[in-house]
Amino acid sequence: MSALTETWQIHNRINIYLLEAIDEANLKDLSASKGRNVGEQFSHINNVRLMWLKVADPTLLDGLPKIEKDHITKEALIDALNLSGKAIEQLIDESISGKIKGFKPHATAFLGYFISHESHHRGQIMLALKQSGHPVDQKTQYGLWEWGVR
């Protein structure tokens, strides 16, 4: 396994670690600035992965669920993020020495793009939960930064 693939795996586990710490009812929490609720943020993360897989390697889409707004559950999100995470991992693993179709400049930048995009949404999720009076516990807050144990 390459360092890039391992980095992606850690990042995906952190997304799921956060999701597991959120009560199902709080998936509907919304930040003061509106936009997507917590569940829709996680759904967006999954669906953007699918969008990129469709461009870069459509064969990796087989069996991957797109999460629609009216079908958001914690279980569905965890399953979808695990499955799409494995597909992105495979895409990165197969592209380490080269390029990702439809993305410039290379696979390392693609990984950086994904981690930046999804971390941005993790921040929005944390803010929405806090502003709604449902912040995740302190152990989880610190745990998001413990890449060496995730």
State each model region's role.
Residues L91-K104:
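Acidic catalytic patch
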